[in-house]
């Protein structure tokens, strides 16, 4: 049975924090959050109460969703999955992040509490590129988790929620079996990408943002051994 990322047994020593002004918005509510350590050492931040004084339910829902999405290991890395989607010609799916014309990357996303890696993979596959498990063939996953650190300028200030210093990911190699028109970038309310294209296998290593290049080099080198 695949191990889940979730809360597991609660330690008696769990403690509580109070984060104010969700998302840096002065009008947003304060939310009390429990930091809970599971059996596998994973820290899961979940809201257990709130103060709705003068705030809209939409703001609260957005804040609660953000808090529910955060699964952080004991070193401060958010756990997630990444996917290398390859077509029949050996080219890789490459997406441009919304609002940043120079930021291209592979699809990726964080684990939700109590979600398996495969469940996270299937959810992100749908949310980011509009594909289902029936559109791809699972080929391989990286032997180890691979981490990268976020530059300090991209890290969330501590007063705005749990501190995350980077991401720790399991990567999957998927064979795309459908037609290009099956790929859709608007399958969720907040799309990750606004453009996509196929690129040569090693192209991403030199064109992803600098702090992810080592990750991409490791992932593609490992997968290259399999597809030769």
Swiss-Prot record:
Q: Which GO cellular component does the record give, naming just one?
A: cytoplasm
Keyword Secreted attributed: no
- Co-factor requirement: a divalent metal cation
EC main group? hydrolase
The gene behind this protein is: rppH
Q: Which residue ranges are recorded for the region named Unknown?
A: 1-70
| PROSITE patterns to which the protein is assigned, alphabetical | NUDIX, NUDIX_BOX
Hydrolase: is it a keyword of this entry?
yes
Look up the domain of life of the source: Bacteria
Q: What does this protein do?
A: Accelerates the degradation of transcripts by removing pyrophosphate from the 5'-end of triphosphorylated RNA, leading to a more labile monophosphorylated state that can stimulate subsequent ribonuclease cleavage.
Provide the alphabetized UniProt keywords. Answer: Hydrolase
Q: Motif Nudix box in this chain: where? A: 109-130
Spans annotated as RppH domain: 71-228
Protein name, as recorded: RNA pyrophosphohydrolase
Q: Which cysteines share a disulfide bond?
A: none
Its EC number is 3.6.1.-
Q: Which family does it belong to?
A: In the C-terminal section; belongs to the Nudix hydrolase family. RppH subfamily.
Q: Which GO terms describe its molecular function?
A: mRNA 5'-diphosphatase activity
**What organism is this sequence from?**
Coxiella burnetii (strain RSA 493 / Nine Mile phase I)
Question: What GO biological process terms does the UniProt entry carry, in alphabetical order?
Answer: mRNA catabolic process
Q: Which residues form the Nudix hydrolase domain?
A: 76-221
Q: Which InterPro entries match?
A: NUDIX_hydrolase-like_dom_sf, NUDIX_hydrolase_CS, NUDIX_hydrolase_dom, RppH
